[in-house]
Amino acid sequence: KENLGFSGGNNLGIQAAKGKYLFIINNDTVFKDFYIQALIDRLESSPKIGIVCPKIRFAWGANPIQYAGYTPLSKMTVRNRAIGFGEEDKGQYEIAHPTPYAHGAAMLVKREAVEKVGLMPLCYFLYYEELDWSMMFTRAGYQIWYEPKCTVYHKESQATGQNSPLRTYFITRNRFKLVQRNYGGIYKWLAYAYLFCVVATRDGIKFAFHGHWDLLSAALRGICDFMFNKQSYITK
């Protein structure tokens, strides 16, 4: 069977589902006292809300926070921060609020919003597709919210590995692709320059210094494939 990637697989599920709400959830998540009604209530609290994400905590150790919303992406570095990341959950993020981006590990989406916005973009295959999709929702006039009354526990990158060539390839290639699709004017060229001159150089030196030639090769292939509009690295 063909591997359609994160977006392709989710799009098949979205098209097959019949309900008013679409709950998109990673296969490496764990539920403990899961309260999905809180997500539904938040989603229905305003016609402007298109996506709601729960609080996400890591499924190991003391279950530190992984996600309590996101900060906006930098126009130059194409970086942002997950609010609360790595912090002990002491109840400091118990107020629901709008957030620029949904988290791909868990999100509840209005079907009517998807029908207006469109399906997940297929060009990423893995990583960054939820950020792009979030931007599509925002451009269509929808809000994305973080709802702390519901919590999901995430094992994080068990399927791909934190330092695998697969992950390195798609992270590298898709950063550029996100800029290509969503940035304009001077910001696009500043971001390209930063990714080429700073990020690619830094990562290349780091991989070479530690002898991670497979990661260096994957990163270089990611850059080349972006430049030639290709996708070639789909094995683990």
Language-model-detected regions and their locations in the chain:
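Conserved donor NDP-sugar-binding/catalytic core segment of glycosyltransferases
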Residues: 30-67, 73-75
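Glycine-rich, basic loop-to-helix element that forms the pyrophosphate-binding segment
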Residues: 1-17, 27
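Non-catalytic, C-terminal membrane-associated alpha-helical segments of glycosyltransferases
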Residues: 166-174, 185-236
